[in-house]
Amino acid sequence: MTKIFRKSDPFIKIVNSALVDLPSPSNISYMWNFGSILGLCLFLQIATGLILTMHFSPSIHMAFSSVVHIVRDVNHGWFIRNFHITGASLFFSCMFIHIGRGIYYGSYKNIKTWYSGVILFICAMVTAFFGYVLPWGQMSFWAATVITNLLSAVPMMGTRMVETVWGGFSVGDPTLKRFLVLHFLVPFLMIAVSLTHLLFLHETGSSNPMGMNPNLDKVPFHPYFSFKDILGFLITLSLIFLGSTLFPYLTTDPDNFTQANSLVTPPHIKPEWYFLFAYAILRAIPNKLMGVFALIMSLSVLLFMPFLIKSNLRSLTFQPFMQFTFWLMISNFILLSWLGAMPLEFPYTIMSQVTSFLYFFIFLFLFPLVSYKENKYLNSRYPPF
């Protein structure tokens, strides 16, 4: 009997087991689409980034002019750049939703999958920061100066680290060249981490909205969920096209349309919107070293979730108090992002400190406490067999 080609060929067999015959829980919803959408966004960002790199000059004297050249003179250059900018915003929007879905439905219980995902998130944040500096606008220059200068908070070797990153005694030509190289290379590292993420995911299997054993009822990924993914791709592409053509500079800062000038400081230095929650936490603490520590912890706190939340139920679907805590965390995250865009003055300073405290309080104390109390209540009402 002749074997099916997709099951017999050594290479195609790997693709088949990951995309065609993959056993998937029958009840997963569209919230499970965002992983594949993130893969599409990463591919589009690399493709458009490669084209932009061909026309970009990594020199402090030419960088801003080369961006103007791309927009004005390169065939469809304005669209490719706008596509790259809008794609980055949508990439982070999908990533935040993907992480939120993972918290809500208990995906952090698959520790290897969760950790590789957090590493991907941190890599994406670092890559976006490098890319923000490249146009060498006013906000790019000052954001690079402020953020890289945070390394000076490291005891003993902080100043040496800052000068190594800068390639001199201030942000300049060597800094720009290094950031271009890193902005170019890290996405390829993200591809490798993404494959590892998929490998760990397929080892344990996907979670499901009910939080039940997913092995009870599974169906092949194709055609049941592949077509749902295609719909997600079409919506994503539509949003990127609409954003690139109708609202291309919706998320960009007006100061970045002015060439970098080290003698003029912008009245309010702020990063892109997807950094604002961490930036608000950084600014909320007057001490520099503690501010940097809080900034790192704002991302690293996700690594502690598998050990902090010990719910008997995997999903929050049947945990009303955990649901309330989750949406409190989401509301606090949105408020932090808004405060990060505000000037550092009263009352925003006090609000930033309160919301920063709440951010860590929810993750480190409220989630574990509520999950413990709900476990205790469930065990008292419905004792295990």
From Swiss-Prot:
Cofactor: heme b
SUPFAM superfamilies, per database record: a domain/subunit of cytochrome bc1 complex (Ubiquinol-cytochrome c reductase), Transmembrane di-heme cytochromes
Amino-acid positions noted as binding heme b b562 in the UniProt annotation, renumbered to this chain: 84, 183
Any GO BP: mitochondrial electron transport, ubiquinol to cytochrome c
Transmembrane helix among keywords: yes
Residues in the signal sequence: none
Binding site for a ubiquinone: 202
Cross-referenced Gene3D superfamilies: Cytochrome Bc1 Complex, Chain C (1.20.810.10)
Membrane spanning residue stretches: 34-54, 78-99, 114-134, 179-199, 227-247, 289-309, 321-341, 348-368
Keywords from the named record: Electron transport, Heme, Iron, Membrane, Metal-binding, Mitochondrion, Mitochondrion inner membrane, Respiratory chain, Transmembrane, Transmembrane helix, Transport, Ubiquinone
Database matches in InterPro entries: Cyt_b/b6_C, Cyt_b/b6_C_sf, Cyt_b/b6_N, Cytb/b6-like_sf, Cytochrome_b, Cytochrome_b_C_euk/bac, Cytochrome_b_N_euk/bac, Di-haem_cyt_TM
Record has Transport as a keyword: yes
Main location: mitochondrion
Cofactor, how bound (note): Binds 2 heme b groups non-covalently.
Localization terms from the record: Mitochondrion inner membrane
Residues that hold heme b b566 according to the record: 98, 197
Recorded family membership: Belongs to the cytochrome b family.
Quaternary structure, from the entry: The cytochrome bc1 complex contains 3 respiratory subunits (MT-CYB, CYC1 and UQCRFS1), 2 core proteins (UQCRC1 and UQCRC2) and probably 6 low-molecular weight proteins.
Miscellaneous comment as given in the Swiss-Prot or TrEMBL entry: Heme 1 (or BL or b562) is low-potential and absorbs at about 562 nm, and heme 2 (or BH or b566) is high-potential and absorbs at about 566 nm.
Function, as annotated: Component of the ubiquinol-cytochrome c reductase complex (complex III or cytochrome b-c1 complex) that is part of the mitochondrial respiratory chain. The b-c1 complex mediates electron transfer from ubiquinol to cytochrome c. Contributes to the generation of a proton gradient across the mitochondrial membrane that is then used for ATP synthesis.
Protein name: Cytochrome b
Designated gene of the protein: MT-CYB
